[in-house]
């Protein structure tokens, strides 16, 4: 399952 751009950005922000 792939994440959405918004979720991806949130995770990358960690």
UniProtKB/Swiss-Prot annotation:
The gene is hbb. It comes from Oreochromis mossambicus. This is Hemoglobin subunit beta. Involved in oxygen transport from gills to the various peripheral tissues. It comes from the Eukaryota. The keyword Transport applies. Keywords: Heme, Iron, Metal-binding, Oxygen transport, Transport. Belongs to the globin family. GO terms for molecular function: metal ion binding; oxygen carrier activity. The lineage of its organism: Eukaryota, Metazoa, Chordata, Craniata, Vertebrata.
């Amino acid at each position: 399952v792939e994440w959405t751009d918004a979720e991806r950005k949130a995770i990358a922000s960690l």
